[in-house]
Amino acid sequence: MPPTRTFGPITTEMLVRYAGASGDLNPMHYDHEYAQAAGYRGVFAQGMQLAALLSTYGAEQLGPRSVRRFGVTFRSQVWVGDIVTGSGEVTEVTTSDTGVRVVLRLALTTQEGTLAVAGEAELEVPTSLWESAETQPQTLTAQGVQ
């Protein structure tokens, strides 16, 4: 699997756009004065926005249609200006008559190495697709095996 995928830097515009799209209108995510008055150093990314970035990295491994399960735990805040990197490792591969199931342990870390989001994804692809990917791993794309 690719070693990493970088996102960012995180901007206030990204947070405002995500707030509008998701309906998460908590001013902690877009109003700097409000966030500082609440004791934070500034606005910070929505947890679900970070989960979406990590799921993007996970889904890119075998294609978005392969995702069967995805879960995260939020560990630390991501601030405006941070650059986050998705990474992962295969922890389990099982085969059946219909396909190959792959479990990934995922992490989203800041440029300082702080773990922001920990996650796990379960992906499943038809055996024929997996065999093609194993013989030509460089052909894996966000749409699956080319």
Model-based region annotation:
Residues L15, D31-Y34, G39, T73, ...:
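A residue-level detector for conformationally permissive "hinge/kink" positions
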Residues M1-T6, W79-Q146:
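HotDog/MaoC-like acyl-thioester-processing domains
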Residues M1-S66, S128-Q146:
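Hot-dog-fold acyl-thioester-processing enzymes
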Residues Q61-G88:
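Mid-chain, well-packed structural core segment of small domains
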